[in-house]
Amino acid sequence: MRRLFSILLSAFLLLGLAPIVNAAGEAVNADRAATDFTASALTTCSENTRFNERASQATTPKDIARFERYSKASCGDDGLPHLVIAATIEPWGALANRHHEGDILIPGHIFIYVAGIIGWSGREYLRASKKTKNPAENEIIIDFALARQCLIKGAAWPVEANKQGRSGDLREKDENISLNGPR
């Protein structure tokens, strides 16, 4: 039953069968009156008066370059760039809408990969330190040689997680988990 549930959950997440929220309707902002917001209300930032006012106040070359880069984006009436991704082609929206992959797809994958490296390296360090003669000391005083080895191994965490998931080594056995503590 657990396996069936995990397969169904994975399929729902992969296929994007979750309800989609539309960004249309009343948008109430604290600094101005309620406006009817849709993606069609956005204009090119280079044509937006509030964006141009903000761009004219740029003083450093870095700020000027940033405003030039943002001038190609879509701005709302507040003069700030907005990211629009069509929800009609989900879950493959970022793949079909290639000019937004630098906004969400690539940074999201990098974040997940780096977070996985950190988590997997920490997990491997704790598992390796349990095999030493004084594991409690290795948790307090970090053995940098062991930590470096675990960090290097952590780069392959997706492959290792898949291997350990198939072999059953990824999860702790139920008999090794205590029920002490608040309930």
From Swiss-Prot:
Subcellular localization is given as: Cellular thylakoid membrane
Region Disordered: which residues?
164-183
Q: Please give the InterPro entries that the UniProt record associates with this protein.
A: PSI_PsaF, PSI_PsaF_sf
- The superkingdom of the source organism is Bacteria
Q: Keyword set for this entry?
A: Membrane, Photosynthesis, Photosystem I, Signal, Thylakoid, Transmembrane, Transmembrane helix
Pfam families cross-referenced by the UniProt entry: PSI_PsaF (PF02507)
**Example of a GO biological process term:** photosynthesis
Please tell me where this protein is predominantly located: membrane
**Does Transcription regulation count among this protein's keywords?**
no
Which residues constitute the signal peptide according to the record?
1-23
Q: Does the keyword Thylakoid apply?
A: yes
Residues spanning the membrane: 102-122
Report biased composition (Basic and acidic residues) as residue ranges.
166-176
Where does this protein have coiled-coil stretches?
none
- Return the GO cellular component terms, semicolon-separated: photosystem I reaction center; plasma membrane-derived thylakoid membrane
The free-text function statement in the UniProt record for this protein reads: Probably participates in efficiency of electron transfer from plastocyanin to P700 (or cytochrome c553 in algae and cyanobacteria). This plastocyanin-docking protein contributes to the specific association of plastocyanin to PSI.
Cross-referenced PANTHER family, in alphabetical order?
PHOTOSYSTEM I REACTION CENTER SUBUNIT III, CHLOROPLASTIC
User: By what name is this protein known?
Assistant: Photosystem I reaction center subunit III
Which organism does this sequence originate in? Prochlorococcus marinus (strain SARG / CCMP1375 / SS120)
What is the name of the gene encoding this protein? psaF
